UniProtKB/Swiss-Prot annotation:
It is an enzyme of class 2 (transferase). It is found in: Cytoplasm. The gene is rsmA. GO terms for molecular function: 16S rRNA (adenine(1518)-N(6)/adenine(1519)-N(6))-dimethyltransferase activity; RNA binding. It catalyses: adenosine(1518)/adenosine(1519) in 16S rRNA + 4 S-adenosyl-L-methionine = N(6)-dimethyladenosine(1518)/N(6)-dimethyladenosine(1519) in 16S rRNA + 4 S-adenosyl-L-homocysteine + 4 H(+). Belongs to the class I-like SAM-binding methyltransferase superfamily. rRNA adenine N(6)-methyltransferase family. RsmA subfamily. It comes from Shewanella sp. (strain MR-7). This is Ribosomal RNA small subunit methyltransferase A. The lineage of its organism: Bacteria, Pseudomonadati, Pseudomonadota, Gammaproteobacteria, Alteromonadales.
Amino acid sequence: MSSKVHLGHTARKRFGQNFLTDDNVINRIVGAIAPDNDHVMVEIGPGLGALTEPVATAIDNLTVVELDRDLVERLQNHPVLKDKLTIHQGDALQFDFSQLVVPGKKLKVFGNLPYNISTPLMFHLFEFAEQIETMHFMLQKEVVLRLSASPGNKAYGRLTVMAQYFCQVVPVLEVPPHSFAPPPKVDSAVVRLLPYAEKPFPCKDVNVLRQLCTTAFNMRRKTLRNNLKQVLSDEEFEQLGIDPNLRPEQISVEQYVAMANMVCDKQA
């Protein structure tokens, strides 16, 4: 049997499918997720149910978002899970997670995410951060390093700034390739994202911050002065106390927010 076949399902490359099979890792992830009935529990990409089963067993209802129709059908016919699940067949990148919110209950979102969509999916989920209590995701280890990086680290970038603007980022555990079927070609890691109830550095317009980060990191080897010359002058950098000769990865989240707020003030 092909190594891409697991429990009778052939992993689809276009969906980035790698199924978690290591019980020890599964138990540790479920422990980190801490499923309960006080939140709306949401799984993205339940796949063959490695996390779905233990989480659903611990609670009354689990909402899942799954793109693969074959896997949706398996879940709909699952002898144990079918009565516990609310299934949304569709693309998580297009999904409106705010529709899942129940009065008095925030979301706890988790999943073993397809690595080919993990970064755009993070940006999509940040839009719903105010409705989310916690997020726990299995990701490519490199993405977890980017999410949790500090200024001056080569992994520090646009994703870092936006993630740490919205959330506290906590790496949970590393997961080797042999914990999956088929084994991915990269190391994986689980990360915990805790959206801030009150952001440490509030931005007047998050879209301005997003655009500023995109512009700043477009040419990582260039200085801020070079990359942001269309939006901020040397005098404005001086007002902010930011050295325009620094590179984009040397600037803190707080400083990016300060720059974005100055741009907002100029546009007002």
